[in-house]
C-alpha cells in the first residue's frame, strides 16, 4: 500500500496509541513507539479516557496506567481531560455529529499507531477502531457509539456497533483530511483487545508485520486479508472472533461511507528494527 508520507513538516502531530490496561502482555513495545515518536518533530502521544469504570476511567488513573506501561518518555495528551467538542459526521445514517475529545483540535496531523488484534465487541481492532473509540471522549462520545438505544448506553446490536464505530471514525478522518496516516502492527494478535490487560487470551496467530497507508479502509482490509490467508490452524481463533462478532461490517460500512478503498497494492519494505533504535 505505497503512499507518500502525508504528515506536515511543521505543526503539531498527534500519535494516537492505545494505552491498554496495566501490564498488558500484548501492547506495542515501548521501544518501538519511542523510536517513532523521537523521529516525528513536535509530536505527542495522545489518548482518551474510557467509558467503562476502571484504571483509565479518570485522567489521574489513566496517567498512572501510562506510567506502569512505559508510556512516560514524552508528553502524553489525555485529549478529553478538558472536555469534548461535537464534530460533524458527513453522510452518516446514525449520527450527524460525534462527541470528540476536545484537545484533538489542537493538532495539525495525526499518526494512528495501532496494535492490530481481536476485540470482544468489534471482532477486531484496527486503525478504524483506534480512532473511532479512541478519539471519542470517555463520557459522551463513547456512550454514543456503544448504543443503539440512548436510554440504555450498553444496549447495541453487533452490526449497529460496527456502523457506529465507522461514523465516529469519520468525524476524525474528515477533520484531518489528508493529514493523517495509519500504521497497523500485526504482532501478539490475541483474540482480545489490550483493554483486557492480563486477562487477554494468549495469541495463537503468528506475527505478520507492519502495514502503513494513508487509506484507513485499505490498511484494515489488508490486515484482515493477511490474517485470513494464514493456514487454518494459525488463523482459526482470530478469524472465529472476527466473524462471530460480524467484524467485517467495519470494512463494508467504511466503503459505503466512501472512507477509503478496499483495493490496494502491497509494497514490501524490509527494515531492520532493534531495541537500540530508540537510543540513536
Per-region residue spans from a language model:
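Extended, low-polarity segments enriched in aliphatic/aromatic residues
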Residues: 3, 8-12, 17-34, 39, ...
Amino acid at each position: 500500500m505505497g503512499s507518500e508520507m502525508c504528515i506536515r513538516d511543521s505543526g503539531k502531530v498527534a500519535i494516537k496509541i492505545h494505552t491498554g490496561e496495566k501490564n498488558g502482555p500484548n501492547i506495542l513495545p515501548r521501544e518501538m513507539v519511542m523510536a517513532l515518536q523521537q523521529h516525528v518533530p513536535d509530536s505527542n502521544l495522545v489518548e482518551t479516557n474510557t467509558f467503562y469504570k476502571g484504571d483509565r476511567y479518570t485522567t489521574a488513573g489513566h496517567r498512572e496506567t501510562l506510567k506502569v506501561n512505559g508510556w512516560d518518555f514524552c508528553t502524553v495528551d489525555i485529549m478529553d481531560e478538558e472536555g469534548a467538542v461535537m464534530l460533524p459526521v458527513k453522510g452518516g445514517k446514525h449520527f450527524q455529529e460525534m462527541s470528540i475529545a476536545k484537545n484533538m483540535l489542537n493538532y495539525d496531523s495525526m499518526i494512528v499507531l495501532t496494535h492490530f488484534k481481536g476485540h470482544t465487541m468489534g471482532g477486531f481492532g484496527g486503525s478504524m477502531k483506534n480512532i473511532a473509540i479512541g478519539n471519542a471522549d470517555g463520557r459522551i462520545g463513547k456512550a454514543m457509539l456503544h448504543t443503539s438505544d440512548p436510554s440504555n448506553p450498553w444496549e447495541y446490536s453487533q452490526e449497529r456497533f460496527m456502523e457506529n464505530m465507522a461514523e465516529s471514525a469519520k468525524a476524525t478522518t474528515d477533520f484531518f483530511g489528508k493529514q493523517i496516516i495509519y500504521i497497523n502492527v500485526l504482532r501478539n494478535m490475541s483474540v482480545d483487545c489490550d483493554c483486557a490487560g492480563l486477562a487477554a487470551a494468549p495469541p495463537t496467530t503468528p506475527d505478520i508485520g507492519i502495514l502503513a497507508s494513508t487509506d484507513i479502509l485499505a490498511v484494515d482490509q489488508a490486515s484482515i486479508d493477511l490474517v485470513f490467508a494464514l493456514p487454518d490452524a494459525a488463523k482459526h481463533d482470530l478469524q472465529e472472533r472476527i466473524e462471530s462478532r460480524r467484524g467485517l461490517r467495519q470494512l463494508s460500512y467504511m466503503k459505503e461511507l466512501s472512507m477509503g478503498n478496499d483495493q490496494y497494492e502491497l509494497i514490501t519494505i524490509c527494515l531492520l528494527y532493534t531495541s537500540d533504535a530508540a537510543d540513536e
